Structures are given as C-alpha cells and as structure tokens.
Amino acid sequence: MNGVNEIRAAFLDFFRKNGHEIVPSSPLVPRNDPTLMFTNAGMVQFKNLFTGVEKRPYTRASTAQKCVRAGGKHNDLDNVGYTARHHTFFEMLGNFSFGDYFKPLAIELAWKLITEVFDLPKDRLLVTVYHDDDEAYDLWKKIAGFPDSKIIRIATSDNFWAMGDTGPCGPCSEIFYDQGEKLFGGPPGSADEDGDRFLEFWNLVFMQFEQRGPGDRIALPKPSIDTGMGLERIAALLQGVTSNYDIDLMRALILAVAQATGVDPDGPMRASHRVIADHLRASSFLIADGVLPSNEGRGYVLRRIMRRAMRHAQLLGAQEPLLWRLVPALTREMGQAYPELLRAEALIVETLRLEETRFRATLARGLTILEDETRHLSEGGVLSGEVAFKLYDTYGFPLDLTQDALRAKSLGVDMEGFEKAMARQRAEARKAWSGSGEAATDTHWFALREQLGATDFLGYDTEKAEALIQAILQDGKEVLRLEAGQSGAIVLNQTPFYGESGGQVGDTGLIIAPGMRFKVENTHKKLGDLFIHEGIVEEGAVVPGLEVRTLVDHSRRTAVRANHSATHLLHEALRQVLGDHIAQKGSLVAPDRLRFDFSHPKPVTPEEWTQIEDIANSVILENAPVTTKLMSIEDAMGSGARALFGEKYGDEVRVVSMGYDEDKADDSTDGRIAPPFSVELCGGTHVARTGDIGLLTIISESAVAAGVRRIEAKTGSSARHHLNTQASLLHSLAAQLKSPEDEASKRLSALIEERRKLDRELSEARKKLAMGGGSSNGADSPLREIGGIKFFRRAVTGVEMKDLKSLADEAKQTIGSGIVAIVGVGSDNKASVVVGVTDDLIDRFDAVALVRLAAGKLGGKGGGGRKDLAQAGGPDGEAAEAALTAIEESLGSSLPTP
C-alpha cells in the first residue's frame, strides 16, 4: 500500500471507518466564494460550516481535495520544477470536525493513521505545537509517548492559523518526519529548519477561538478541527523518495514526457520534465472544471501555466504541440479518482492543442526579442523592466515566462521597472475610464440600497402588482420629479418586472396611476436585489410616494420565458450529444432569440446539430411540467443540479427541473418515476410546461473564442417564422434551379462544380492568350532580347492578381533565363503589375526595384515582394504599355549594347 491511488483510498477509508462523511472534492473554482481565485485547501468548501453560517447533516467529514496554487497570495509557479516539493496542482487529504470532536480525538486519529495504517516508524516522527498550547503538548506526550525533545513549541504564526482578520482561528500542530542525515537541515524552530531533512507532512488546526478584532479573541462554544496532509508528500515518505517528483504518479507523467521528446528525464533537462508534468495536471484539471485560457482572471492564470509548460516543451526540442499528447497518461493515473478528467478529456486535449499551436508564434517572437535584448548582458545581469513589460503587454509573454527563460542564462528582471510600467498602464486605463460616471453611479446604488432596502420581486407569480414609488433617478442622480417626455428610472418597493441578470433581458411594460403613465423600456438589477425601472414618462408626472400599478408586457415576457426554458433543454441536449465536458460559458435570453455559449473544442457537425434539435424538441413535445423548488445550495448540488462555475449563489437557491412528470412513470424503470431531463440552479422566469416552448430550431453555430462555441436559436412563433422563411427560400431556389425541392441541394452543388470547372478553363484560356506566341522577332512579340538578356513583356485584361503571378512563373519557365513583366488591367481600369526574375539573374536584377518603376507609371506608389518576384498596382490602366516600356528602358540603360 504505497501507490498514490492506494494511499488516497486508505486515508479516506480510515476516516470512513471512524464515522466521517466522505465528501467529494469541490471544483477548483470555489463555489460562492469571490475572495478566492482557486480552491487552495481542503477547508475551502467547508468555510461556511466553520463560521456557523451553514448546517449540513454531518459533523465529521474527510476529503481528498484537488488544489491549485498559482496566483495571488498562494503562488508557487516560479518555483515549480526547481524544488522537490513545489507544485501548482496538488491533492490535500483532510479530516474535519464541525463542533464534534476536538484535540484529543484529532491527535489520536492522526497518530493511529500514520503509525498503524501508514506504518511510519515512530522514532522518525516529531511534532510542533503553538508555544502556549499546553493541552496539545500534553496530549502528544500521552497518546504518542513522545519525549519533550520530540514536541517543539513554536511561537510564530506558522503554528497559529486564522481565516482572516476576524473569524475562527486557533493553534496548529504540525507533524514532521526525519528523512535522515543524508539530507541537510535541522528540526523546526532551528536555524537550519529550511533544509529538507525534517519534512512537515500533516497540519492539524485546532479552531478554538473567534477573533473579533485586534486584541479581542474569545473562546468558541463549539471548537472545530481542520487538518491538511499533502498527498504527494506522504506518498514520497511511504515510497522512500526525497522528491515529490519521484513518486509513482509524477514519475509516470515524467516518463511520458521523456518518451514523447526522447530526452533523458534525469539529465540536465530534468527541471523541464518536472515543469511539464506538474503543469499538465494543473491545466487539465482547471479545464475540466470549466476554466478556459483567456487574458483575464482565472483564464489568464491558466494561460500562464500552459505557456510555461509549452516553453519547457520547446526547450526539450518538441517541434509540434506536445501537452495534448500527454493527456492519456494523466487520465490513466488519475481518471479513476477524478472521473471529471475522463468526461472532459476531449475538451482538455483540444484546448491544449489549440493553445500550444497559437503560442508557438508568440514564443518565437518573444524569445527573439529576449535574445536581442540580453546579448550584451553578462552573467548576473538584469533585463530592463520596460522590455519585460513590452513582452508582457504587446506580445502576450507572461513575466514568469520571461524570468524562466532568463534563469537559464543566470539573468534577472528589473522588477521595479516592470512594476512602474505596469502601474503606468493601470493609471492610463483608469484615466481613460474616468468620467464615465460608472464609479459614482455604483457608489450611489450602495447608498440607495442601504436607504431603501431590497426590492421585493413578485415576478415569479404575477405580471401585475400594486407598488409604491420609493425613488426617482435621472442621469444617475436622485430627483424629486419627472415630467411628461422626460426619461429616467424608478425604484419601487416591490415589482413583477424581472431585472436583467443571468443572461435574461429585463422586462418592459407600464407603470401607471391616475393621470400618470410611465413606459418601462428596460429593468436592471443592481447589487443583486435593487430593481431599477428605466423608461420615459408618457403622461403626467412621476413623484416619490405615488401609489402605482405595474403591468409587465405579457407577450414579451411569454417569449422570454420560452427562450429561457429552451436554453436549459439545449444545454442538456448538448451534453448528451457532445459529452459531459459541455459547460455553459454565457447566454442571452431575449424575446426573439436565444444565444448559448458553451465549452467545446470543435464545430458542431450537421448530424450533431440535428440530434441536439431532436432531443430538445422531444422534451418539448412531451409537454412535461417545469417545476421550481427553493432549497439550500448543498441540497441542490446533492440533487445533481447544474450550477455555473464562478457564479455567486445565496444560501437558498431556485432549482428548475424540466422533463419530469409526477403523474407519469417510466416503463423502463418498472413503474418508478423517471429522473428529470434537466435540473439547473436558475433565477430566471420559465414556462409552466415544456410544451409552452412550442418548437426550438437552431439558426447558427460558430466559434467565439478558443474552445468556446456559440449556438443561436429561436422558439415558438419566431422559430415558425424562421422555418417558413427557409421553406420559402428553398421553394424559390428549387423553382429557379428547375428541380424538386428535395434535390435542390444536389442540383446546386452540381452547378457550383460546373461553374468552378468553367472558371478554371477560362483562366487557362486567358493565360494562353496572355502568353501569346511568336518568336523574339518583331515589335509586337512579347519576347525580346536586351543586351543578351531575354525580356518577356505583356499587357492583359481580365486576369486576376493570382493568375498574373502564375503567368509570370510560367513565362519564367518558358524562357528559361530572363526577366518577365506582366500588367493586368481590370474592368475598373485599375492595373496590377508583376515582375519576375529567374534565379540565375537575381544577383544582377531586383524584381522589387523594377516593379516600382512600373508602379510609378501606373499612378501607384511602392511595390513589394522578393528579388525573384514582386508585385504592385496603380489606378491608371491606360498606362500599361508605358509601365512595361519603363522597365524595358531601365534594362536597356543598365545592360551593354551587343
């Protein structure tokens, strides 16, 4: 029992047997926690349990949590590959008590696991405790039988953990393993504690206090336990190796890199193998959890990780994209423990392949600039911060990649200069943004929300309601009155109008009172629950305190509801046809159409398109109920509801289920109720039954970003109108083609192919005509000799530039040695000119110089190309012969007379 998968299973099994709920790893994108970029510890998903905000049906839990540290406070990126234990991705094993057991059992369980299950030798173990934690000190003596020398008191923050400036906190006890005298280092607390000999592998946090402010700390009525053990670290100990990169899992990935590149994994390029193995894990798991490479936020961190790995692939000599070819090795090692890797394998592979293909050009440009800028620097030198910033800002070359490339040359970066350039850019961005009024407006919303409280939303149950005007705004400022003809915004105490959010557009309609009529043109939602009704006063005046009646535009709301429900059906149909890697990346729900962005590495085929439509429409035809339930976020996720990654949800969420009819049983399940077709967390408005959608038809599919596709669709009457238009178009097309409608496509394809064939024949005929014939004698001949050099000149009409080039190439082959000049005149009388020089003459003649002479005669400027072939143009086609004569005269003056 010392393989990584066996160790993970043994840890969880031990705590299962000791009454702990085994909770699956949460995603790397923290749910409902905007303070974190990535999940970086096992306790992240339990934060609300520790603070008492949330309750769950268990008080003991254990997890194997996937973690990423590559951004913000916890950033290990720069060290990865160069040390024995730094990673961007790692697994943290942990056990947790939420007001259940405390120090005695926590220490007892830890000791039993490491000495009885993991069978670590007791004489190699030692622990630290916080300097005044006498209870933990005494418990270690009692349970483990440690002498005083093996229990080290530490007074620093290393042994005291806090969630923040306020909140739960408490002392820690860290467990260390002595790896022996072969490694340098001293015990914790000593001058040499940073060495590798004494390895900390498990941290027990005793949450027994609440920090209420500076110097204000009280005891918690129900203390808790939070522990974290690095899986890679304990695996290294159990496998008898001193580096995490030598454990079985990492070694398998490193050997896959070596096999793909043919480079010794234990030679001078060892660090590059390690970087790729680590970054492959981080990149793949992030993509599987819905993160895609981009230029901001989490996507940018992912891009940095991927590009650093790609840089090291280039150092290993990889001539083609490498990372995507390593994904099968990763899924073999970790797919069983984390099935999301298997579900998203196609997306991971394609995302890595596309990103690396794009980055190769960026990498080449960046490395060329680096080479030029560092050529004059000696060992220990520093690259200008301005240059490093230019690489980052202009060429998309992350700073850590620049630092990594310079590390091999023993060079550094002027970080102060880089930060100054970055600060200057931010200041310019702020300056460009200032004056928009957005910052002041946002501040105003906070003040207004605090003054008025939340707007009570009634729109799930009604489209009409009585309300009271609480505030009026115009140009972002609060006013006391709006007259007829004036535009502004109204805040009500309650409203049936849906505020734009979650991709769904805001409602429109009317707000009326005796003698007053306000047309609502849009509804926004600020700060989550403050509804702003924008529009224009059509009659009377609007004043605060006025009692009004609200009327949502029913037909528009009905169309929006249908489109929103259709996006849910479309989402699930996409997953069923394309795979479980499908994740929503954005949406628009409008009355006339819907738009759905989703993660997928390649275009949807026509066959898949049809399947997706058929599946969604089959659920619509069932006319099954659409049900909505309010439940806790935990219960919702436990029920299988899908949530958007990175979306912030409250303690209570709306769960929308479709394709579930409690009055019908599924014959295939022996009378049991069939599961819902779609279950999602959603705050939007929906139809009562799927049949209310009427019909769904996809009208387009396209790419919007790397690894992100977009489908646009219509429902109901809009869909019928679209299909009727398409049918009319097909009928008209078939009539013009004189073919049955079901054969129109085949007939059109045949005509297109026939047209292409005629175009090719016409092009060949024009080229033959342009080449002409005859000998080198006579003034009208296209071929003449000047000073012993053959010169072919020709002015033609109706020949495109691409054909001019092929004409020039053909003429060069025909004459064998010489110079070719051809001018083509279009129907608009504009001219194009091509000059070609055979290879044996390019040391004497330059096609670019000659073509520029012709361009001048044609009224053009410049010209470009190579010494053997160049092109130019001009507006004066009448001067075609003059342009050719200019080239001929230039040749005549530069060549000796025979």
Swiss-Prot record:
Catalytic reactions on record: tRNA(Ala) + L-alanine + ATP = L-alanyl-tRNA(Ala) + AMP + diphosphate
SUPFAM superfamilies per the UniProt record, alphabetical: Class II aaRS and biotin synthetases (SSF55681), Putative anticodon-binding domain of alanyl-tRNA synthetase (AlaRS) (SSF101353), ThrRS/AlaRS common domain (SSF55186), Translation proteins (SSF50447)
Catalytic activity, EC: 6.1.1.7
GO annotation, cellular component aspect: cytosol
Listed PROSITE patterns: AA_TRNA_LIGASE_II_ALA
Required cofactor names: Zn(2+)
GO MF term (any one): aminoacyl-tRNA deacylase activity
Binding positions for Zn(2+) per the UniProt entry: 564, 568, 682, 686
A GO biological process held by the record: alanyl-tRNA aminoacylation
Pfam families named in the record: DHHA1 (PF02272), tRNA-synt_2c (PF01411), tRNA_SAD (PF07973)
Keywords: Aminoacyl-tRNA synthetase, ATP-binding, Cytoplasm, Ligase, Metal-binding, Nucleotide-binding, Protein biosynthesis, RNA-binding, tRNA-binding, Zinc
Subcellular location: Cytoplasm
Cofactor note: Binds 1 zinc ion per subunit.
Role: Catalyzes the attachment of alanine to tRNA(Ala) in a two-step reaction: alanine is first activated by ATP to form Ala-AMP and then transferred to the acceptor end of tRNA(Ala). Also edits incorrectly charged Ser-tRNA(Ala) and Gly-tRNA(Ala) via its editing domain.
Domain notes: Consists of three domains; the N-terminal catalytic domain, the editing domain and the C-terminal C-Ala domain. The editing domain removes incorrectly charged amino acids, while the C-Ala domain, along with tRNA(Ala), serves as a bridge to cooperatively bring together the editing and aminoacylation centers thus stimulating deacylation of misacylated tRNAs.
Family designation: Belongs to the class-II aminoacyl-tRNA synthetase family.
NCBIfam families: alaS
Name of the protein in question: Alanine--tRNA ligase
UniProt gene name: alaS
